[in-house]
A protein has these predicted regions:
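Interface amphipathic segments
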Residues: 1-170
């Protein structure tokens, strides 16, 4: 099936590749259309910056998709392997992919139901749903905390009973 993403994008940034890109991206008048329907989104911004130690902060401010930030020192082309290694470390026979040392990231996001509704129409999450955690390549640390006041999946509802909290640490 075909999906259509429309919107106005304004970029005020510097850098010559994704690894040193910093600045602001403004996304306005956005809509996403798929066979299920058309979804309009409030204007939002993505800000990428570095501190004096070259630690990157990416902040997303979208009032109806997701709000939060990722902070860390990592290479985009190694993110997939960082995540795979973190999840794979749960298994005893997992062979991790090689990644550069010194990479880490922390994330903290509030996720809104609209984005879940688009990709997973049978799932609904409550307001104030938060996902946060961190990944560290050197000590293979992986922490994940997911907290939602309510999750509805198909005909199942989880609320106020502790089923909606997931905390995992390695």
């Amino acid at each position: 099936s075909v999906s259509i993403f429309k919107g106005d994008v304004v970029v005020e940034a510097s850098g010559n590749n994704i690894e040193n890109f910093q600045g602001n991206v403004y996304i306005n008048k956005t809509s996403y259309q798929n066979p299920k329907g058309t979804y309009n989104f409030d204007d939002f911004t993505i800000i990428s910056s570095f501190d004096q130690n070259r630690i990157r902060t990416i902040t997303v401010n979208s009032p109806d998709i997701v709000e939060g930030e990722i902070v860390g020192k990592y290479e985009f082309n190694q993110l997939e392997n960082l995540v795979k290694n973190s999840l794979g470390s749960l298994y005893t026979n997992f062979k991790p992919s090689k990644v550069k040392k010194g990479q880490f990231l922390k994330f903290n996001f509030s996720i809104y139901n609209k984005i879940i509704e688009i990709f997973y129409p049978d799932i609904s999450i409550g307001s104030n749903t938060i996902i946060k955690g961190n990944i560290n390549s050197d000590n293979q640390e992986f922490k994940l905390n997911f907290n939602s006041p309510q999750i509805i999946a198909s005909d199942n509802t989880f609320d106020k009973q502790g089923y909606y909290k997931i905390h995992y640490q390695i």
